[in-house]
Regions:
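Short beta-strand segments
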Residues: 7-9, 45, 88-89, 117-118, ...
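Active-site regions of enzymes building and remodeling cell-envelope glycoconjugates
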Residues: 54-62, 147-150
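Residues at secondary-structure transition points
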Residues: 17-24, 58-69, 94, 98, ...
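A short, conserved beta-strand element in the Rossmann-like catalytic core
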Residues: 14, 52, 93-94
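N-terminal glycine-rich phosphate-binding loop and ensuing alpha1 helix
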Residues: 1-49, 100-101, 105
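Conserved beta-loop-beta/alpha segment of the NTase-like Rossmann-fold superfamily
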Residues: 64-131, 135-136
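Short, low-complexity, intrinsically disordered N-terminal peptides in bacterial proteins
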Residues: 1-3, 109, 164-165
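Conserved alpha/beta core of the MobA/IspD/sugar-nucleotide pyrophosphorylase nucleotidyltransferase superfamily
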Residues: 134-165
Length: 165
């Protein structure tokens, strides 16, 4: 079983958005995950804001400690049958379900503790964490773990609304 974890616990304060950007962007991310053929479950990690979500959620009381704390909350909430977690960000509205499937299929074929999509050689999301990697998630989250990269150059990167263009 492979579960997706959507990190949506942040305060959304960088650009003073109101209502929280998670409310606007989450439906796009969740729709992309539901179109992916390789996922069995989706979990959204919330924290700073109460956000309406069409799906399963967990609240992270330590969300202010950063993405690692939010990711650990999500990992702890997954069922014992989960072999791996596919991590995505709530503020990546252009997530392509083909990238999700590509990362998962690469992990199934070649294994590895951490497998991430790369666009133009740059590591982005989604990032798959095999259960063996879960105990080692640092405070900065999955980006603090070395990953095997999967080429997604032919796909649009997931975007990040926190990056001004």
């Amino acid at each position: 079983m492979i579960s997706a974890i959507v990190l949506a616990a942040g305060a959304s304060s960088r650009y003073g958005t109101s209502p929280p950007k998670q409310q606007e962007l989450l439906p796009h991310v969740l729709a992309a995950l539901r179109r992916a053929a390789s996922l069995d479950d989706v979990l959204v990690v919330l924290g700073a804001h109460d956000v309406e979500v069409d799906g399963r959620t967990v609240r992270c009381p330590d969300w202010e400690r950063g993405p690692g704390a939010s990711l650990r909350c999500g990992l702890e909430a997954l069922p014992a049958s989960a072999e791996a977690a596919l991590v995505v960000l709530a503020d990546g509205p252009e997530l392509d379900p083909r990238a999700v499937d590509r990362v998962i299929e690469s992990w199934r074929r070649e294994g590895g503790d951490v497998v991430a999509a790369a666009y133009g050689g740059v590591r982005l999301h989604p990032v798959l964490l095999a259960r063996s990697a879960w105990p080692f998630v640092p405070d900065e989250g999955a980006r603090g773990l070395e990953a095997r990269l999967v080429d997604c150059d032919d796909l649009t990167p997931p975007g990040d609304v926190d990056v001004r263009r």
